[in-house]
């Protein structure tokens, strides 16, 4: 058995512009090779574009997009007697928002378009309107969990 103590979760500092932890998490997810200021500019430009195009508060649209993209259940592989089962599990809130942000950034990157800020803005607006690759991924995750409901008793 491990003798290590449980490590406390570090609080995520909110970003300076919107004072939001979600925006801060998105900036960190966009960042590559430690270029945080470039990642911050991309996210802030995307949110500004969202605000201009929708005529709403950009942070509200972004939070709605993340809420829409957050999965409620996911499947985890569990080995039982030589067979591997996909066991549906409920998603905790912090993991759900992390998955939603991961999918938002991934599908923004795979999108066609000129700038990353533009692609991210389009993906955020699509997710807020319950369309786009991110929402498709959430629906696929829910379908997988529904299909494997028979193995729910293997939950751990």
From Swiss-Prot:
One of its GO terms (biological process) is translation. It holds the Pfam family Ribosomal_S7. Keywords: Ribonucleoprotein, Ribosomal protein, RNA-binding, rRNA-binding, tRNA-binding. GO terms for molecular function: rRNA binding; structural constituent of ribosome; tRNA binding. NCBIfam families: rpsG_bact. Part of the 30S ribosomal subunit. Contacts proteins S9 and S11. Belongs to the universal ribosomal protein uS7 family. One of the primary rRNA binding proteins, it binds directly to 16S rRNA where it nucleates assembly of the head domain of the 30S subunit. Is located at the subunit interface close to the decoding center, probably blocks exit of the E-site tRNA. This is Small ribosomal subunit protein uS7. It comes from Microcystis aeruginosa (strain NIES-843 / IAM M-2473). The gene is rpsG.
């Amino acid at each position: 058995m491990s003798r290590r103590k449980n490590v406390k979760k570090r609080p995520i500092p909110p970003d300076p512009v919107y004072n939001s932890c979600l925006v801060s998490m998105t900036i960190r997810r966009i960042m590559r090779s430690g270029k945080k200021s470039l990642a911050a500019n991309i996210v802030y430009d995307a949110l500004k574009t969202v605000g201009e195009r929708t005529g709403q508060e950009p942070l509200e649209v972004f939070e709605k997009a993340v809420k829409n993209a957050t999965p409620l259940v996911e499947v985890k592989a569990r080995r039982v007697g030589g067979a591997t089962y996909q066991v549906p599990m409920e998603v905790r809130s912090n993991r759900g928002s992390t998955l939603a942000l991961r999918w938002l950034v991934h599908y923004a990157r795979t999108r066609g378009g000129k700038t990353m800020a533009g692609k991210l803005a389009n993906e955020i607006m699509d997710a807020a309107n319950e369309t786009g690759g991110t929402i498709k991924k959430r629906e696929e995750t829910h379908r997988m969990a529904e299909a494997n409901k028979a193995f729910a008793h293997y939950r751990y």
